[in-house]
A protein has these predicted regions:
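DUTPase catalytic domain/fold
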Residues: 1-191
Length: 191
């Protein structure tokens, strides 16, 4: 089997080139870079963290520490992690662009541990990177859990799998070929 080359361009000095844990793994891990939050997003995150602390009966001391944090403290926190609250989606940058070979597509799948332990997975279930796309690969990561999660900068957030595709030409017809199954749909083949 011919081994194709996946060209990868780092768009950010801290970006990680995708890696495989084992030579025969299908997926290459994608790594998180910091999100550049707007001032409103930063304010929203602070308020959500305070609300969570209140709901969890945080002590007055804990709340004082939260509110006493300086802008510099918050900037350091935002540079080190990506805050993803329950049932929210965040576009997580990877800092890389890829040149998927013609005749292939890049599929962005969940990492099993992140999905099963923390409820984090691509919002679109499977992200697609077409062979002619050359901008930054980002992961629309959704938190399906009821707990907030902080993604560390440099954390593995998804996996990229390169798969062959068949480029069929769509043609409108008046009739389709008959098959034994016909129009029998969901559940028609039994349990």
């Amino acid at each position: 089997m011919k081994m194709e080359v996946l060209k990868i361009k780092k768009l950010h000095p801290d970006a990680h080139v995708p890696t495989r844990a084992h030579d025969t793994d299908a997926g290459m891990d994608l790594y998180a870079l910091p999100v550049e939050y707007t001032d409103k997003e930063k304010s929203d995150i602070k308020n959500k963290l305070a609300a969570k602390a209140l709901l969890q009966s945080a002590t007055a001391f804990d709340l004082d520490l939260l509110w006493a944090a300086t802008d510099s403290d918050w900037e350091q926190a935002f540079a080190k992690g990506i805050y993803i609250f329950p049932h929210e989606t965040v576009m997580v940058p990877t800092g890389i662009a890829v040149a998927v070979p013609t005749g292939y597509m890049g599929c962005i799948y969940a990492r099993s541990g992140l999905a099963s332990k923390h409820g984090l997975a691509p919002a679109n279930c499977v992200g697609i990177v077409d062979s002619d796309y050359r901008d930054e690969v980002k992961v629309a990561l959704h938190n399906y859990s009821n707990e907030p999660y902080v993604i560390d900068v440099g954390e593995r957030i998804a996996q990229l799998v390169i798969q062959p595709i068949s480029l069929c030409t769509p043609v409108e017809v008046d009739e389709l070929d008959e098959t034994e199954r016909g129009s029998a749909g969901f559940g028609s083949t039994g349990k």
